[in-house]
Curated annotation (Swiss-Prot):
Gene: Mapk3
Entry GO CC: caveola; cytoplasm; cytoskeleton; cytosol; early endosome; focal adhesion; glutamatergic synapse; Golgi apparatus
Protein source organism: Rattus norvegicus
Entry remark concerning the domains of this protein: The TXY motif contains the threonine and tyrosine residues whose phosphorylation activates the MAP kinases.
Record PTM Phosphothreonine, positions in chain: 199, 203, 208
Lineage: Eukaryota, Metazoa, Chordata, Craniata, Vertebrata
CDD domains per UniProt: STKc_ERK1_2_like
Location (main, coarse): cytoplasm
Name by which UniProt lists this protein: Mitogen-activated protein kinase 3
Residues the record lists as N-acetylalanine modifications: 2
Family: Belongs to the protein kinase superfamily. CMGC Ser/Thr protein kinase family. MAP kinase subfamily.
PANTHER family noted in UniProt: MITOGEN-ACTIVATED PROTEIN KINASE
Gene3D superfamilies, sorted: Phosphorylase Kinase, domain 1, Transferase(Phosphotransferase) domain 1
Length: 380
């Protein structure tokens, strides 16, 4: 299968084209939309794809593999948060090996720590992403089923490594012309830790609001793998209707969208909310009745709606797991537990990155990328 790059720190990006590309001269650095890409001589013929908060993505011709690739130019070193996300993504993707998770083919950077201003991450080139695809067409049930299977197949691997993606959304699902799908953008990923404290009621959370599980907004600790399943449920609903199911404008609006469809939580579900302020807020709201999925999606496959219901369950303890979702009747034609690999061992971060200064994070990025430098020993 093929793989690719998404615009760092952002969603879709602009359509691919030759605008802003300066023709290459041997020995010179190519410039894309004013940005120098110091990636020669192996990578040439750059074309702009898109850009995000702290970098730009271009396609390029790889003279070794004889194919076009995607190159992310990341310039994160002025900001602790960008350094943190860059390091986390590199750490995870260099250790992951799965057909439905984006891989890293190569990393280019300056030969010394002092000279390192940018990092170039080379990945397989994908033609589009699910966000762009849903903007342009209504998917058939067959396509929805196949894309959902691949999302869950990749997520099974991620979760088996004890990692939460935490930012699953259509623009982070890359797709090529043969409908292969790869999950990308692991900058917000974390080790699954149900006991880690996430302080505060309705404090700002970095992942895209529309795909956030309700417990993220309501609890101060207890994030589990079920938050990713909620996001996949939101993505399935969006594939069925070509519009986001919970497009909240802010926190409380987001909760109101969710409760407006799922109905008021039961007393048992309220009991799983450990934050008393949040629980009291929910109990103060007028009672709401659940809306039938078939009413929202009258033309959709009934098995798809049953799986959707099991994913978009308010109580994370009752939400379907990724293994259970793969075995659901809706995905029967693809389900093959012998071809749904898991990680060889749980992923562990050597240290908590949140508290490290950007200078230390830069050193760690330099170390993590050393294996790609000329003369470095082959990676295992």
């Amino acid at each position: 299968m093929a793989a690719a790059a998404a615009a760092p720190g952002g969603g879709g990006g602009e359509p691919r084209g030759t605008a802003g590309v300066v023709p290459v001269v041997p020995g010179e650095v190519e410039v894309v939309k004013g940005q120098p890409f110091d990636v020669g001589p192996r990578y040439t013929q750059l074309q702009y794809i898109g850009e995000g908060a702290y970098g730009m993505v271009s396609s390029a011709y790889d003279h070794v593999r004889k194919t076009r690739v995607a190159i992310k130019k990341i310039s994160p070193f002025e900001h602790q948060t960008y350094c943190q996300r860059t390091l986390r993504e590199i750490q995870i993707l260099l250790r992951f090996r799965h057909e439905n998770v984006i891989g890293i083919r190569d990393i280019l950077r300056a030969p010394t720590l002092e000279a390192m201003r940018d990092v170039y991450i080379v990945q397989d080139l994908m033609e589009t992403d699910l966000y762009k695809l849903l903007k342009s067409q209504q998917l058939s049930n067959d396509h929805i089923c196949y894309f959902l299977y691949q999302i869950l197949r990749g997520l099974k691997y991620i979760h088996s490594a004890n990692v939460l993606h935490r930012d699953l959304k259509p623009s982070n699902l890359l797709i090529n012309t043969t409908c292969d799908l790869k999950i990308c953008d692991f900058g917000l990923a974390r080790i699954a830790d149900p006991e880690h404290d996430h302080t505060g009621f309705l404090t700002e959370y970095v992942a895209t609001r529309w795909y956030r599980a309700p417990e993220i907004m309501l609890n101060s600790k207890g994030y589990t793998k079920s938050i990713d399943i909620w996001s996949v449920g939101c993505i399935l609903a969006e594939m069925l209707s070509n519009r986001p199911i919970f497009p909240g404008k802010h926190y409380l609006d987001q909760l109101n969208h969710i409760l407006g469809i799922l109905g008021s939580p039961s007393q048992e579900d309220l009991n799983c909310i450990i934050n008393m302020k949040a629980r009291n807020y929910l109990q103060s709201l007028p009672s709401k009745t659940k809306v039938a999925w078939a009413k929202l999606f009258p033309k959709s496959d009934s098995k798809a709606l049953d799986l959707l219901d099991r994913m978009l369950t308010f109580n994370p303890n009752k939400r379907i797991t990724v293994e259970e979702a793969l075995a659901h009747p809706y995905l029967e034609q693809y389900y093959d537990p012998t071809d749904e690999p898991v990680a060889e061992e749980p992923f562990t971060f050597d240290m908590e990155l949140d508290d490290l200064p950007k200078e230390r994070l830069k050193e760690l990025i330099f170390q993590e990328t050393a294996r790609f430098q000329p003369g470095a020993p082959e990676a295992p």
